[in-house]
Amino acid sequence: MSLAIDAWARVGTVDDVPELEGRSITVDGRRIAVFRLPTGWAAIDAACPHLGGPLGDGLVAERCVTCPLHGRRFDLVTGEQHGGDDVVAVHEIAERHGEIWVRLAEPS
């Protein structure tokens, strides 16, 4: 089933993602990474724009994730690369009754 861009999709429960970790999932054929931060949740496109590294497997510190392939860091709130020009799409994310919901952004 295809989702409209403005539709919310359930992507799991709060227990699926430990704090300061990420998980990659597929929503409507699009790979995204969901992260649990001390202050809430973040969701971005799962592939690093450099060489497609799996951002969902990256190291999370404060509000950034570091790509496990080449160390590029991305802000999980803005999607911007620290010290570079690359950007990943940021998706809306919400926790409702112990479930995690995402609304996809337009592809970047």
Mark where each language-model region is:
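Short helix-to-coil "ATP-lid" hinge immediately C-terminal to the conserved N-box Asn in the Bergerat
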Residues: R73
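Short cysteine clusters
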Residues: C48, C67-H70
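N-terminal pre-ligand scaffold of iron-sulfur
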Residues: M1-E62, L76, E80, A89-S108
